[in-house]
């Protein structure tokens, strides 16, 4: 009897130890996350963005029009299509970058920023995006400058410009170590953790809206993603250049419709955003427990999760572009943040704040879903599920290439 109970005792002990280890790991990750976002990353991201803005002469402001003209002006011209087989057109490279940038962060991330940081978080999201445009400009220029040809294709990114750009400054060994550390971190963050988050969001949204089992959604995702990924960067770019404009236009159109439906809320909404950016208590009341610190933290954090400025992911796409000068692709890169954060993320914020969905007590994507249901009764959940599926799926294939 005593010997027969041993396996059950063993299983129980393993379960308890596993539970304790999970609790310890969760607490450790939470503590590290708090230190990073409270004391380091916010200041680093804003500081670096401010530095590049001043040092480079605010290219995101002075060259914004030129950037749009460069990317979209020759979109249908023969010149844009006659790029070498080893590279992508400027628009294709931007489409791949945006396909990765526009994901669940544009839907659930913005909702989290508003519920955890108040309406004022949107102001700080805008500010971090504007400053981040200069950071991503620098990333794309460096990716172009230090790219190499491998198997007949241009490849590049932080691993390359860290190795080749920093070797004269810090030595080859130190540069290779930093390059390797970055590469491993990126593979883990995008290839494993990030894509798991995106696919889980798709499965949950589809299950909730159409009652399709998550397992079936997961299998379908794996099949479709595999068919695209197996074709390499050219097939990924070919899909992205058509899907990205379509999904962005549809989503922004939804926001425009909601603007008209709730037009009487527009002025109070913007008033709340700007007042709550510096004094959240004036809008939410002291009982909400949200101060300026939370507004800044969640606004900047959600902005980064969405536009990836300074993250080192999108330069992999920008390195492949066929342009005459690296600065051209730098301008294309900050156009990506303009579209991702200042247009698509702002669309989500407007949808949530105009419908007062942020006051419901819900969190994450459920807030955005409630907003869509209020704005489009009867099919709001289904509409959002389709949009979220496009957003997250293109992020999966984009992140696979980056990782």
For each of these PLM feature ranges, what is it?
Residues 131-139, 219-233, 244-264, 297, ...:
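Selective recognition of specific alpha-helical transmembrane segments in multi-pass small-molecule
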Residues 52-53, 128-154, 163-228, 387-396:
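Helix-loop-helix module between adjacent transmembrane segments
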Residues 59-88, 112-121, 134-173, 358-375, ...:
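Flexible loop linkers connecting adjacent transmembrane helices
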Residues 44-48, 55-68, 178, 182, ...:
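Membrane-interface loop-to-helix entry segments
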Residues 137-151, 254-272, 280-287, 320-323, ...:
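Extracellular/periplasmic helix-exit of transmembrane alpha-helices
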Residues 241, 247-314, 319, 370:
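Membrane-embedded translocation segments of transport machinery
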Residues 9-104, 114-120, 132:
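N-terminal alpha-helical transmembrane segments of multi-pass membrane transport
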Residues 79-115, 142-145, 151-165, 181-187, ...:
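Alpha-helical membrane segments and immediately flanking helix-loop junctions
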């Amino acid at each position: 009897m005593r010997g027969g109970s041993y396996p059950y005792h063993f299983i129980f002990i393993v379960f308890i130890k596993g539970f304790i280890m999970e609790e310890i790991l969760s607490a450790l990750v939470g503590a590290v996350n708090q230190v990073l976002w409270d004391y380091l990353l916010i200041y680093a991201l804003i500081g670096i963005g401010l530095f590049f803005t001043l040092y480079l002469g605010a290219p995101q402001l002075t060259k914004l029009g030129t950037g749009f003209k460069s990317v979209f002006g020759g979109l249908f011209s023969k010149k844009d299509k006659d790029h070498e087989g080893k590279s992508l057109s400027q628009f294709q490279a931007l489409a791949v970058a945006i396909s990765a940038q526009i994901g669940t962060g544009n839907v659930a991330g913005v909702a989290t920023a508003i519920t955890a940081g108040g309406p004022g978080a949107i102001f700080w999201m805008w500010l971090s995006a504007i400053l981040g445009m200069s950071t991503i400009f620098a990333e794309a220029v460096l990716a172009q400058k230090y790219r190499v040809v491998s198997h007949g294709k241009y490849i590049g990114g932080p691993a390359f410009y860290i190795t080749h750009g920093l070797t004269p400054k810090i030595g080859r060994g130190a540069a290779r170590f930093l390059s390797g550390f970055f590469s491993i971190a990126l593979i883990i963050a995008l290839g494993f953790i990030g894509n798991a988050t995106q696919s889980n969001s798709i499965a949950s949204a589809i299950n909730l809206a159409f009652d399709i089992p998550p397992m079936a959604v997961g299998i379908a995702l794996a099949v479709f993603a595999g068919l695209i990924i197996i074709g390499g960067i050219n097939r990924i770019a070919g899909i992205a250049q058509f899907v990205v404009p379509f999904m962005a236009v549809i989503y922004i159109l939804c926001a425009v419709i909601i603007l008209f439906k709730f037009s009487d809320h527009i002025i109070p909404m913007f008033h709340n955003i700007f007042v709550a950016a510096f004094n959240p208590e004036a809008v939410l009341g002291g009982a909400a427990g949200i101060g300026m610190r939370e507004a800044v933290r969640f606004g900047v954090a959600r902005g980064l999760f969405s536009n990836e400025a300074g993250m080192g992911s999108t330069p992999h796409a920008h390195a492949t572009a066929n342009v005459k000068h690296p600065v051209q692709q730098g301008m294309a890169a900050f156009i990506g943040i303009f579209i991702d954060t200042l247009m698509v993320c702002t669309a989500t914020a407007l949808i949530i704040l105009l419908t007062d969905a942020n006051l419901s007590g819900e969190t994450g994507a459920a807030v955005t879903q409630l907003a869509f249901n209020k704005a489009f009764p009867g099919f709001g959940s289904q509409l959002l599920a389709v949009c979220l599926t496009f957003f997250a799926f293109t992020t999966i294939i984009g992140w696979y290439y980056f990782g």
